Amino acid sequence: MSRNDARYLRCTAALGAAFFACGAAAAELTSPPVAPATEGVAAGLSPWQIRVRGLGVLTEDSGSINGVPGSDLSYSDSLIPELDISYFFTDNIAAELILGTTYANIKEVGAVGVPVGKAWLLPPTLTLQYHFTDFGAFKPYLGAGINYSLFYNQSEKAGFHDLDVDNHVGAALQVGFDYMVDEHWGVNFDVKKIFLETEWKADHDVLGPLSGKAKIDPWLIGAGVTYRF
């Protein structure tokens, strides 16, 4: 770096610091009075909030058939509508329940290389969230909680019978943000990681009874609309 470049960077940094200080001082002068510490939820707002999102379900392709070396499983990804309901205990602490249903086509992609079947999945997920409130309309949050994955309406491909995927309880992690357009409406982006590893079994015309593990561990990536009552 040349001496002139270094001088330019120092000047730029000094100007930036000055603007930041002036902006902070102006914010202090123009900020409304701080709400009393006893108020648990923003004044005038209900503790209830809903979101409607489009949700991409991106699975991790991993699994096995017991007793079959080199076996592996893959699962189809999907795009679904999703509803979530949140309740704010305070301005920062909330609980969120997501509701939606999806399906996965299951295929053995290792030693056998054949489609196994299809299973529908209802994965209600409850998370406890911390919402950051220091960034104006931009409201990021972090969450962690529990997922219960309920498999239903399972069907088999040719050669397979009696496919059964066990229901599963697992952990969930979450990060996202709302950008509020006004007091009630906003847009949302949300990412969740669901830890889902379960057991499955089925009968095959040639191979007989089969069983194994299905490690799905999906990413749930959603975007949509927020409404705070």
Curated annotation (Swiss-Prot):
One Pfam family assigned to this protein is OmpW
**Cellular location of this protein?**
Cell outer membrane
Record's bilayer topology term: Peripheral membrane protein
Q: Which UniProt keywords apply?
A: Cell outer membrane, Membrane, Plasmid, Signal, Transmembrane, Transmembrane beta strand
Give the domain of life.
Bacteria
Q: Which residues form the signal peptide?
A: 1-26
| Positions of disulphide bridges | none
* Record bears the keyword Transmembrane: yes
SUPFAM superfamilies, per the entry: OMPA-like
Family note: Belongs to the OmpW/AlkL family.
- What is this protein identified as? Uncharacterized outer-membrane protein y4mB
